[in-house]
C-alpha cells in the first residue's frame, strides 16, 4: 500500500489477521482482540493466524476490513474519506466480490471515489507495455494473463492454484526428509525465509540433480533464529522446480511454462507473436534466480521454431502490480 506517484509502496506487510489462542494469557498487556500484518507475524506464538485472501480471492470480509483499516490508519496514516482509492483484484475475480469490495470502501470507509484494477494489467503497465502476457505468481495463486492494448482477455486466463505458499510447504516437507523438523506456523515462516534467500531454478533440472549428488557446490548453510545452523543442498532448486513440474507435489496441473503456452494458444492467431515477444513475470514467486532463462528455454521448446521469444523479468517485479497502480492513479486522464 502507498501513494500514487511514489516509486515504491510505503507499507508492505502480510495479509494476515491473528487472534489470541487463549484469552487472558497476557494479563495487563492491554491485549487486543486482533492483530494485523507484521504484528500478527511477530506474536504468532500466541495467536491463531488467518489468511482472509485465499488463492487471490477475498474469502473473509470481516478480516479483510481489519486489514484495510490497519492500512489506512496505522500504516499510511490517512483518512480514507480524504482521497480516492485504487484497489486491485485477481483476474477472474467474481463480480459479487468486486461489488462487496466497493460497498465496504464506500459504506465503511466513506471513500470519495474508487477504482478496481486487474493486477496483471498493472504489472504490464509497470513494464512499459500495453500488450503482452503476464505470468503473475504470488503467495496463493498464479495466473497467466494475455493482455491486448490494455485489455485482459478473460477467455484465455487459466488460474493455477500453485504459488508461494505451496512451495514453502514443499520445502518444509523435503527439509523434514533431510532430518530437520518444521511444522508450526512459526516454523513455516522460517522456511519461507530459507526459500526466499536460498532457492533458485535450475536451467536443466536432471543435470542439476547429478551435480548435487557428486559435488557440494550447491550446498549453503542457514542460521535458524535459535542459533542452530542447517545445511541445504539440492532442496534449493528442488523447491521451486514444482512451478515447472506440479506433479512433484501430486498436482495434475500443467507447469507455468505450459500454462503460459496454452494461454497464448487460446488467443487470436494474429496477436500470438506480440504475446510470445512480451512475456512479463510478476509477483514474489517469480523472484527465483534463473526463472527467466528457464522459462525462455521451456517456451522456446513449445513454440513454433521461427518464433521470437522474450521473457522479461523486471527487477522490481515483486511490487510491479503496486508500481503499475501508482503510475495509473497518477495520470490526469485517469483521475477524471
UniProtKB/Swiss-Prot annotation:
Cellular component terms per the entry's GO annotation: actin cytoskeleton; cytoplasm
Xref: InterPro entries: Actin, Actin/actin-like_CS, Actin_CS, ATPase_NBD
CDD domains given in the database record: ASKHA_NBD_actin
GO molecular function: ATP binding; hydrolase activity
Reactions performed catalytically: ATP + H2O = ADP + phosphate + H(+)
Biological role stated in the UniProt entry: Actins are highly conserved proteins that are involved in various types of cell motility and are ubiquitously expressed in all eukaryotic cells. Essential component of cell cytoskeleton; plays an important role in cytoplasmic streaming, cell shape determination, cell division, organelle movement and extension growth.
Name this protein carries in UniProt: Actin-52
Amino acid at each position: 500500500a502507498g501513494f500514487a506517484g511514489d516509486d515504491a509502496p510505503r507499507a508492505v506487510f502480510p495479509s494476515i489477521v491473528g487472534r489470541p489462542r487463549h484469552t487472558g494469557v497476557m494479563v495487563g498487556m492491554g491485549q487486543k482482540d486482533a492483530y494485523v500484518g507484521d504484528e500478527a507475524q511477530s506474536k504468532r506464538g500466541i495467536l491463531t493466524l488467518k489468511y482472509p485472501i485465499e488463492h487471490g480471492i477475498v474469502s473473509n470480509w470481516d478480516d479483510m476490513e481489519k486489514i484495510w483499516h490497519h492500512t489506512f490508519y496505522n500504516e499510511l496514516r490517512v483518512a480514507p474519506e480524504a482521497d480516492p482509492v485504487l484497489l486491485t483484484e485477481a483476474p477472474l475475480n467474481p463480480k459479487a466480490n468486486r461489488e462487496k469490495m466497493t460497498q465496504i470502501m464506500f459504506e465503511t470507509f466513506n471513500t470519495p471515489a474508487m477504482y478496481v484494477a486487474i493486477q496483471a494489467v498493472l504489472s504490464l503497465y509497470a513494464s512499459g507495455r500495453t500488450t503482452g502476457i503476464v505470468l503473475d505468481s504470488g503467495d496463493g495463486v498464479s495466473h497467466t494473463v494475455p493482455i491486448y492494448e490494455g485489455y485482459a482477455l478473460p477467455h484465455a486466463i487459466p488460474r493455477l492454484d500453485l504459488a508461494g505458499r505451496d512451495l514453502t510447504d514443499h520445502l518444509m516437507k523435503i527439509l523434514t526428509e533431510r532430518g530437520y523438523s518444521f511444522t508450526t506456523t512459526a516454523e513455516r515462516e522460517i522456511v519461507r525465509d530459507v526459500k526466499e534467500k536460498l532457492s533458485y531454478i535450475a536451467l536443466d533440472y536432471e543435470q542439476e540433480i547429478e551435480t548435487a549428488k557428486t559435488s557440494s557446490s550447491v550446498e549453503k548453510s542457514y542460521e535458524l533464529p535459535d542459533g542452530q545452523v542447517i545445511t541445504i543442498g539440492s532442496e534449493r532448486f528442488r523447491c521451486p522446480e514444482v512451478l515447472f513440474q506440479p506433479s512433484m507435489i501430486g498436482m495434475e496441473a500443467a507447469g507455468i511454462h505450459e500454462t503460459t503456452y496454452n494461454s497464448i494458444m487460446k488467443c487470436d492467431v494474429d496477436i500470438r507473436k506480440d504475446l510470445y515477444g512480451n512475456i512479463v513475470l510478476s509477483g514474489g514467486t517469480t523472484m527465483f534466480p534463473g526463472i527467466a532463462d528457464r522459462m525462455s528455454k521451456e517456451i522456446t521448446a513449445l513454440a513454433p521454431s521461427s518464433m521470437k521469444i522474450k521473457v522479461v523479468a523486471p527487477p522490481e517485479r515483486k511490487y510491479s502490480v503496486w508500481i503499475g497502480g501508482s503510475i495509473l492513479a497518477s495520470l490526469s486522464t485517469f483521475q477524471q
